[in-house]
Design a protein with these regions (language model features):
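Acidic, surface-exposed loops and disordered segments
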Residues: 1-250
Length: 250
């Protein structure tokens, strides 16, 4: 239900930004403010050729190879979750590079079923936060229900240690503070079709690539664990909210 609108700029053939088409054949169009990026199959030109040559020792001196490896290790060491965001949007070019890095991650059996949905619309970002908080509020009501509590303590006793965190998130949200997305101006959701056997693993490999690229670009980022947890608790609720076919993993 999506069609390519334009390729990623600067000749980067890693995927296409997609937008929704009008309603047709009973299919729901995806919201227009979502950038949908789907991976392409083999046959892409390789922008990482120089780095690969360095890693293989071709066309490079030992000194430059050592420098490359040192820089790579320094990047891995410097990667941090950083929730201190400004209100400025992330440059589109930086977002494109982050998505390309994610796309370059390996997938099980080279199936390449991983897809990416980039959300930059402020209202939709607020809806993601609201969905997450409401999901946790529902969990709290169940855990604290006096009729269910004896059974739940046996079945999911470990969940009760998270109650203080849930109450804090809900309370802060009620006072106008977002501890879910922390005021982020963009969220990249990584998902695969339902039934993808290694969808979770593939998606999290893609996340790590994206995380390292964001670090190298000086873009503050963190893993949205609360959002992923809420998505897992609520069936396909978040996917339906965002018009995503499949399951969000990262």
């Amino acid at each position: 239900d999506l069609y390519p609108v334009r390729p990623v700029r600067a000749g980067v053939p890693v995927g296409h930004f997609h937008a929704s088409r009008p309603e047709a054949a009973g299919r729901r169009a995806a919201p227009e403010h979502l950038h949908r990026l789907r991976t392409l199959r083999r046959g892409l030109s390789d922008r990482l050729g120089p780095a690969r040559r360095l890693s293989r020792g071709k066309s490079a001196s030992r000194g430059s190879r050592r420098a490359f490896l040192a820089q790579m290790l320094a990047l891995c060491r410097s990667r941090r979750s950083n929730r201190a965001f400004t209100s400025s949007p992330v440059p589109e070019r930086a977002l494109e590079m982050i998505v390309e890095a994610a796309h370059r991650a390996p997938t099980a059996s080279n199936l390449q079923q991983v897809a990416f949905t980039l959300v930059t619309d402020p209202d939709t970002l607020r809806r993601i936060t609201a969905f997450t908080v409401e999901t946790f509020a529902s969990v709290v009501r169940k855990l604290e229900n006096p009729l269910l509590k004896p059974l739940l303590k046996v079945l999911v006793g470990g969940a009760y240690k998270y109650l203080p965190n849930f109450h804090r998130l809900i309370g802060e949200y009620g006072e106008g503070r977002d501890l879910i997305l922390r005021g982020a101006t963009a969220v990249l959701l990584i998902h695969t079709p339902d039934g993808s056997r290694f969808g979770c693993q593939d998606s999290n490999l893609a996340y790590q690539n994206a995380s390292l690229m964001a670090e190298s670009l000086g873009v503050s980022q963190f893993y949205t664990g609360f959002v992923c947890s809420a998505a897992g608790q609520a069936g396909h609720g978040l996917e339906k909210l965002l018009g995503i076919d499949g399951k969000i993993h990262a």
